[in-house]
Amino acid sequence: MNRVHTIAWRLLTASIVLCSCFAAGTVAQTASPSPQPSPTPTPEAKPASQEGANPFTPEAAPPLPAGMTGSDTGDPRSRLSPGMYEAGEAAMGIKHLMLLKKPDAFQLGSDDPDHPKVQKALSLLGVADASKIPKSQQLATAGLAFANSDLAFQGNHLFLGNFYGVNIYDISDPLKSRLLTSMVCPGGQGDVSVYKNLLFMSVEQPNGRLDCSPQGFPPGPPPAAGQEKNPPPPAAQKDRFRGVRIFDIADIRNPKQVASVQTCRGSHTHTLVVDPKDKNNVYIYVSGTSFVRQSEELAGCSGETPDKDPNTALFRIDVIKVPLQAPQSAQIVSSPRLFMDPRTGALNGLSSGGTHGKDGLEKPSDTDQCHDITVYSAIGLAAGACSGNGILLDIKDPVRPKRIDAVNDPNYAYWHSASFSNDGKKVVFTDEWGGGLGARCRANDPNKWGANAIFRLANNKLSFASYYKLPAAQGDSENCVAHNGSLVPVPGRDIEVQAWYQGGISVMDFTDAEHPVEIAYFDRGPIDPKMLVLGGAWSAYWYNGHIYSSEIARGLDIFELTPTQHLTQNEIDAAKAVRVAAFNVQNQEKIEWPRRLVVAKAYVDQLERSQALPADRIADLRQAIQSAESRKELGKLKSLVPSLEQSAGLTKSAADSSRLRALAEILRRPAL
């Protein structure tokens, strides 16, 4: 979540200019080489010239640009009633099983702005004098201190990151999921990954402390006159922590911090990297998007431009090596310059190429950060979503990742995250236009802005195929844009479930890269119809048969897919046949399907849907599979293999050819 600033800064920007009331501790991301970013008002954060303006008051979308198409106002998701827990709901192909509300310690717990917990939350966010912020804005702002963020999974446990710490759930029975452990440890965003007995957590905000204690640091003085838009960084603190925390979770009810690796820009997100050739260590790619801290606080940190300091902390990621037998010895082992121009050696070798803005095309800006990196070790590649660019990395040597391709797009405002198709032949990038706080799915918001961009990948080169955006128009008070998702392991298809903040959850089929389609969804009405309150689905991931979503304001949602004309029960059952021991979405692992007949039935359904085989052959296949299931008669199955292989060589559809070959392989040697 971010574009040019952390969400904390975006929420508080208008309060700075209206009242000059909080410290620079919440200053954050920069998408330019400037060492200290300047707030950029968005439609939700109005210019200071509008005296008394409320930055949370929704604004209608500007006119749709010529030649662009917006979202569908006729969709049932566009007319849902508002509310925190009583909001209207709409769903297709998804059943909502339960919502586990946030634990009390991770909620404001009061609608009274003067409540001590509300005031403490504002202090954590760097507000020096809350009395100068209107009461309604105080509540909306304070909620950020307890925002849910990303998810990770291991065995029967789900790890839910939060700006205030981590919550661990027992999901051994998804219908009876329950909270096991709450660990208070502020610092935001709190993105998490897990490997064996280790839990990793990203910390970026300046309220993080080495010992995880929640008191933060005293807010600094208000910015001096003329510095409201570019306040100084917070005063150096020896106990401040910004980087990656490492916990030992051998005792799941009592995590112990065993290491804390400091970085110059903190860790907005991180990526767990497992080297198949190295059994003794794991690696962490750290994506820092926040301001560069002072060298007085962490030696060697510099936020200067490359021409002033070639050792600048900008224009790089950090790689942490974690010895599995001695995680307390974790340390940064390299800081790759992923954006370097190989011809000139210039660190700022990539730029956005220009993007869209309120007043038309904006000038290109240098890319100096990655927001998120997804590694796919099975193919030795990673896809980086890096502010102004999407990049492709060779990670065969995980300590020294090398950029091998890069793309940009004038329709993209901020390259946010990436996912590979299972065969590694496609990459889905997301654009977080509006930084996650903006309402960007309104009827007049173009469906190429704040969308997914699907690229084909061949010979280590990316080529654009199409866009996909949530098709349903959302309201002016609903923050909505493309966000985090994962593959759904339906064999024979490329399907991704994805979070869209208050746009809900959308399931996209991108098997045909040029024509992606929505096949399922779930959505709620706005939290507040009159105020843009940060909420909705941060992440939506498939894990061992269910969909889990971190709802920013409400808690943990659990879903299951249901059959429709777009997805059969056999396809859902085949996806459920895939079981994994752990899941960290940025560390993508190859999906392998068992040679079970339920998987064969899914392929048959797909071949019927695409009309790749005539009806009589579909009927023969189903009859043979049924006989094998009920009477263990395998002879008929094997007799069908030659004709399937022949059809695979004749069909013009690459997808159907792959399905036919996979089906033939199962029928030849089914696992009963």
Regions found by a protein language model. Give the residues of each.
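Feature marking well-ordered beta-strand scaffolds used for ligand recognition
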Residues: 29-603
